[in-house]
Amino acid sequence: MTLRLKSALATLFVLLFSLGTAPALQADTRDFPTDLIGLNFSGAGFAPQVLPGKPGTNYFFPEASHYRRWSAKGIRVIRFPIIWERLQPQLGKDLDPTYVKLIDQTLDNAKRYRMNVVLDLHNYMRYRGQIIGSQAVSYQAYADVLRRIAQRWHGHPALVAYDIMNEPHDAVEQWPIAAQHGIDAVRSVDRARPILVEGNGWSSSYLWPRYNAKLLELKDPADNLIFSAHVYFDNDGGGKYLKKDLTAFDPDVGIRRLEPFITWLKQHGKRGHIGEFGVPDNDPRWLAAMDRLLARLRKECIPAMYWAAGPNWGDYPLAIEPVNGKPRPQWAVLQKYVKPSDCETLGPR
């Protein structure tokens, strides 16, 4: 390339940049917060079978008061599930302005109360029931929505990370391919923020090594991937917590569910994160098991996001929102771990 051509191209880039048409590529690396306890602020993903649904009727975005209350209690990081079909009603097309505006408000509320947000595409590796990588939902369509997410929100100071897919399942072959497409899409816009990668098998920490060897082949030009697992203590790990799940109860059940994930991370030199964990409020044995799990996570410097906070949970036994102003039993355990961390980086260590 000649010097004259280089000069002309440089001039063109400056002109495009000044007009706001050059691609934005954020390059200053941001670290993921080391706060041990965060919360899932759910509601925007309620009633996914009702599409598009109505805000305030079928799905709910937390009001500013939620952010104010939890910030005052020391919560600094929230995971915020959003639904692809509501965000992008047609594949490859523009984002829905109503849903976008509500996400804007979410990030603004978080900024106001000094909280960090992980945007979580809460879709189980599917769009309208069709798996990514199928004829109906191409890998390129998945990359498109993540690129649009990054383009829309990468400049917001409250956005701390992208969780590029919640709980992929029954997709051993497709998920690593999709994940690479998702990483590439985000990195075409934002090389600063971490990308959280969940695992096939509903992101189960216990099943992680069985289904996720291929994730070790993922490439990130920013070298800022974090693997994110989920931990529930009931028999099938699905978070239903039936009475039979207390038969032959083991207070270390959470630690046993966690260990395969921790071992995998250490073996391969990867960083880890727990995107969901939670217990019901109807038996103190679950609280004791959660306490033990959190002590183990604190030792390893692995942050964990409780499922769940947010509006309109009703009598859902895992919910952490106060009832008539009274804290839920789970909070007595969680608040023990809501304090400044001595961890300098994410573990395990």
What are the language-model segments listed below?
Residues 10-20:
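Bacterial N-terminal signal peptides
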Residues 1-12:
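Bacterial N-terminal signal peptides that target proteins for export
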Residues 55-60, 135, 143-160, 165-303, ...:
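Extracellular glycoside hydrolase catalytic/binding regions
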Residues 42-47, 77, 83-88, 123-127, ...:
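Solvent-exposed loop/turn segments at secondary-structure junctions
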Residues 47-55, 84-101, 123-138, 240-244, ...:
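Surface-exposed, active-site-proximal loop segments in enzymatic domains
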Residues 61-83, 258-265, 300:
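Catalytic domains of carbohydrate-active enzymes, especially glycoside hydrolases
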Residues 25-77, 93, 332-337, 341-346:
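N-terminal carbohydrate-binding accessory modules
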Residues 58-76, 92-123, 130-161, 174-187:
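An active-site-proximal structural segment forming one wall of the substrate-binding cleft
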